Amino acid sequence: MPTFASMDEKGAPDMNPEQWANAVYDPLNKAVDEGRLVIANKAPITGLGEGWWITPGTIEKIPEIKGMTAVEILEHPEWFPFKEDPSKGAFHGCPAGWGCQLANANLFKAFEMEKKGWVLIDPGSAAGLDGSISKAAESGNPWFGYYWNPTSIVGKYDLQPVPWGIDFCR
């Protein structure tokens, strides 16, 4: 966000090669509409993004999960026991202060995940989120949560994206 804020307020730097536009969606569109910024290439890389993922160990331990959508997985918090209260499911969210934190918190609320028996885990930092994935993947335990790609974690642990199962853009 600091690079975007500097560009928007000071006009420098001239170029931002990697901006997650969804993290600054409204102010970016306003800056473009007002002529302060220009989007030179709207989609330089395809097939990338962010979303909800599971580890291959999840599929090995819960074979029926293969091909399921997020909406279907949300009916099974028992597959991802929360350490502090195993009667609830653990969903690993986005680190505090990141743009994706609000999006994931809103999805958690919109999908009524708490009512379904889920707990939204704040990993505290990118390292905390990576650590939760590494620990689950290396031990073969189920893991369900937010992540993005391309990243070394997605490649190293062969994380599997979970389709939403609903159409967000009608």
Predicted regions and their residues:
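Pocket-flanking alpha-helical
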Residues: 1-34, 131-135, 152-158
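Structured segments of extracytoplasmic/periplasmic soluble domains
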Residues: 4-10, 27, 31, 76-80, ...
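Ligand-binding pocket segment of bilobal, Venus flytrap-like solute-binding proteins
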Residues: 18, 92-169
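A conserved helix-loop-strand patch within extracytoplasmic ligand-binding domains
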Residues: 24-93
